[in-house]
């Protein structure tokens, strides 16, 4: 069973999921990290960027992610084109994960799903959205040295009802709420998660 975890930049998705992986031992995967792996020389993502955007965006080791990001983030049509070109890679990866976790729970952080709901939703059994107070989000993004307004526009607002977990307190508290939801799934007839640990 695959559970998608979505939310805008700065809400703490990665931190919460890493906490869940470390302390509750759920398998956790990150779509962004998968794409970054695909950007290595010799991988499909590297070839796509080089062929479709030009050799100036790659070096002998990998895609120059910083240069590519500066280019596509300032041109929405090009960002959409990049997303559409890499989408089949992500979908094939999700197919593999879905086959691997038919009777166990795994979580996948995939924020871009909110932009391409119909393309990614069929791969997941459930969806969890992480939200956070706007002031905390801005502080988190500024600490990362990114353009707050630009980054917040990258991910669309949800257009469908999604279970939402608020991350305004501690990472542990947010992770607890998520794992309580996962526990309810594990206890249902949908799947069996052999290594689940009940939050204390």
Curated annotation (Swiss-Prot):
InterPro entries listed in its UniProt record: Depp_CoAkinase, P-loop_NTPase
Listed EC numbers: 2.7.1.24
Pathway the protein takes part in: Cofactor biosynthesis; coenzyme A biosynthesis; CoA from (R)-pantothenate: step 5/5
A Gene Ontology cellular-component term: cytoplasm
Catalytic reaction annotation: 3'-dephospho-CoA + ATP = ADP + CoA + H(+)
Keywords from the named record: ATP-binding, Coenzyme A biosynthesis, Cytoplasm, Kinase, Nucleotide-binding, Transferase
Residues annotated as transmembrane: none
GO biological process: coenzyme A biosynthetic process
Entry GO MF terms: ATP binding; dephospho-CoA kinase activity
Subcellular location as annotated: Cytoplasm
Positions bound to ATP: 10-15
Residues annotated as domain DPCK: 2-200
Chief site of localization: cytoplasm
UniProt record similarity statement: Belongs to the CoaE family.
Known role: Catalyzes the phosphorylation of the 3'-hydroxyl group of dephosphocoenzyme A to form coenzyme A.
NCBIfam families: dephospho-CoA kinase
Protein's name in the database: Dephospho-CoA kinase
Source lineage: Bacteria, Bacillati, Mycoplasmatota, Mycoplasmoidales, Mycoplasmoidaceae
């Amino acid at each position: 069973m695959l559970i998608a975890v979505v939310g805008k930049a700065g809400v703490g998705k990665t931190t919460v999921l890493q906490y869940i992986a470390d302390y509750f031992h759920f398998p956790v995967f990150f779509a962004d990290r998968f794409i970054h792996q695909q950007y290595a020389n010799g991988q499909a993502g590297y070839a796509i960027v080089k062929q479709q955007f030009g050799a100036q965006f790659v070096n002998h080791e990998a895609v120059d992610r910083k240069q590519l990001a500066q280019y596509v983030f300032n041109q929405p049509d090009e960002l959409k084109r990049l997303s559409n070109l890499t989408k089949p890679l992500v979908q094939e990866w999700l197919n593999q994960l879905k086959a691997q976790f038919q009777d166990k729970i795994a979580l996948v952080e995939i924020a871009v799903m909110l932009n391409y709901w119909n393309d990614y939703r069929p791969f997941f059994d459930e969806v969890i959205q992480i939200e956070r107070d706007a002031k905390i989000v801005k502080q988190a993004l500024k600490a990362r040295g990114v353009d707050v307004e630009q980054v917040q526009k990258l991910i669309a607002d949800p257009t469908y009802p999604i279970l939402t977990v608020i991350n305004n307190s501690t990472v542990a508290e947010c992770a607890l709420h998520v794992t309580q939801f996962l526990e309810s799934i594990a206890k249902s007839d949908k799947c069996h998660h052999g290594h689940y640990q009940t939050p204390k």
